[in-house]
Amino acid sequence: IPLKYFVNKKYSNILETLSKKFELYIYLPTIIKANYRNLLSLNIENAIKSYNIKGFVLSNISNLLLLDNVLENCSLNKNNFNFIANYTFNIFNNHSVKELKELGFNRFTISPELNKETILDLTSSNTEVLASELIVYGKTPLMNMNYCLLGKANKCYPNCDAKCNSCNKYYLKDRLGLNFEIIPDNIQTVTTIYNSKTTSIESTDFVSTNVFRIDVIDESIDDINNIVSIVKSGNRFEGKEFTNGNLNREV
């Protein structure tokens, strides 16, 4: 679950329930601005104290350094938490996997840029080194911008009408008429642009992968239950709004 939801008090009851029923991981942001580092560190500390946190999904190496400081300040043992290297690490080869193991990671997420052949080779040759996970459903983030597209600024101003807090959905439309959803983060004034199509992959093709991951943004509970059923059955969604990513492309 993204860190920003641990900051917002209105989600506290939901997070409390989830932490009791499931293994709860804090998903750290790709961009952490220097002037927000202390604030986010404090938010992580509060989340660890308030909920049963199983581990963290890290977006880059700087996240690891940040967590080292946070856990030290809380007098907590790093080995009591699981660390997952997110797809943003762009792990392409066995050397990178071994390096992650040395850094203390417990699992790595396969890069969406890899094709099927490379994924199979990477997972099968590292089963004894580091566990792997594959995103089999979800819209892939294409870009993280250090800027708010809705407010047209790199920070929040008092006169901003805060479109980011509304329930509306916002998109960028390209010359082909495809809509790319944008989701702002009003904590740091960062915007994420998502792919116009949703990735959907057959899990049965990747028997050496340890974990299959589902990324949801604003899907309903019924949609999520349907997604879980499809993934568990080893199938994928079909239709023009879905894609199998780069599975059939050359790397």
For each feature predicted by the language model, list its residue ranges:
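Active-site pocket-lining/capping segments in soluble small-molecule metabolic enzymes
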Residues: 1-251
